[in-house]
Each structure stands twice: as C-alpha cells, then as structure tokens.
C-alpha cells in the first residue's frame, strides 16, 4: 500500500432500493471521484485518527473521524487479500462515516447542482458538483 486519498462514496439510492443491493448503484460512470492527491503511507502515522467533514452546499452533513469506522483499514486490507489478489494501483474504499442522507429522519438526498465538499485531515479537500444526466 502506498498511501491514502479521499474517495467520494457516491450512491444512487433509487437504483439500490430497486435492485435490493448496492453494486449497480455505486458503479455508475463518474461515481467514486477521488483525490486531490495521494498522501504517502509514511506521512500518516495513524490513519485511524483523521478528522473527516462532508459539506453539501456549505452545510455540514458529516463531522467525524476515521476512528469511528466500523472496520479498521488494516482489517479491510487483510480481509480482501484472502479472497482476491490486490495489485499495485488498486483502490480500496473504506466507506463513509455516519450522516448519510438515507439515515436522516427527513432525508436530504443530493440534487442536480449540489456541491459536495469532503475534507479529511492531512489528505486535503475534494469538491464535486452533482450533475444529473
């Protein structure tokens, strides 16, 4: 593993609810944008202790830490490597902290034109405009 970067874990919930599984609703072209760069592994002493914020149109939707992840990064890599060959260049997504629209009492799903900004301590910030096709 060479390092860490931000990956915007986009989901098309309408497709996921219809299909009753997540694969197609996360695999749409343009989903999972990542960046803004790779921070090398040696620059991050504890990847399980990074502050994470997600804003939609400037409104904070997620304010958490990688310490709150359900499965630690090392365990994710170990588990995946048992069933598949991990190759240089592979990207492994750890998922997202609490605060996704689906879990809200009154869900605020992303709309055409919304701007999503994700910041992870020491990894930078990515901004993506939602465009419906």
Predicted regions and their residues:
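Catalytic-pocket segment enriched in acidic/His residues
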Residues: 13-133
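N-terminal accessory regions of nucleic-acid-interacting proteins
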Residues: 1-4
């Amino acid at each position: 593993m060479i390092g860490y970067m931000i990956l915007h874990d986009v989901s098309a919930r309408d497709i996921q609810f219809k299909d009753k599984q997540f694969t197609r609703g996360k695999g749409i072209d343009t989903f999972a944008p990542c960046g803004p760069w790779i921070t090398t592994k040696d620059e991050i002493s504890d990847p399980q202790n990074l502050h994470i914020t997600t804003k939609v149109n400037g409104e904070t939707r997620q304010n958490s830490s990688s310490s709150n992840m359900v499965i630690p990064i090392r365990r994710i890599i170990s588990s995946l490597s048992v069933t598949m060959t991990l190759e240089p260049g592979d990207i492994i997504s750890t998922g997202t902290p609490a605060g996704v629209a689906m879990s809200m009492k009154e869900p605020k799903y992303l709309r055409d034109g919304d701007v999503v900004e994700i910041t992870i301590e020491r990894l930078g910030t990515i901004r993506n405009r939602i465009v419906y096709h």
